[in-house]
Amino acid sequence: MRGIFSTGVLDAFYDHQYRPFDFCLGVSAGSTNLAAWLAHQRGRNYKVITDYSCRPQFISFKRFMLGRHWLDLDWLWEITIREVRLDLERFADQPIPLFVVTTKVADGQAAYIRATAQNLEHLLKASCSVPIVYRDFTVIDGEQMTDGGVADSIPVIKAYEMGARDITVILSRPDGYRKKRPRSPWLLRRILSKTPRLAEAMITRDMRYNRSIDFIENPPEGCRIRVIAPSNGFAVGRMTTDAAKLKAGYEMGLQAARSLF
């Protein structure tokens, strides 16, 4: 649900016709927001987050305790494709490449896959598939994939390696946030005993996240990084369904982006 902030940022970009980018890298909810923005669908993801994602058919701890999904992405993808589908034709017709970050279940490494009209919806589902709370893995090109945020939450170093020297980063945490190591790594290893490399990637996620923050705070010579992040008053967490908090998070994103103009 923290993706509501970048929803606001990108809707503001849309309002100002701000599209100066050579390419985009998206992770988890951020990838879905970028896809809607590139497809010129202002407001689409605001509805997805504040309506569909808040319904008990999608988010249910009781269902999780019964051995099923806490976050049912199968239901969410099916209903949003039916009722508020991304405009795949318009996405394909625009010139800015989108690379979606996923995590390979077999080895816990990041994959950066270029989105097309043919693979977009499947890629986005893979990148949003948070391990444990969504009990399945999405298969891309014969390989099981999961949440891109596990392997590379902030792909700023990858953007630099791809040649970017003027980089805009949209964060879902306040500026200065540092990720901490999980308190119970043994529990993750136990829950994910069938996928040990993925378990280790989740346990060491803080190292990669904080390395990206270090890169942002101390970019190489000749590299400019602009950060758009929520303020410390951002009250939206992964499971937030409170309408007022979600609306405030969206407005915060709108305002943060508008300050650029």
Which role fits each region the language model picked out?
Residues 1-27, 35-261:
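Patatin-like phospholipase
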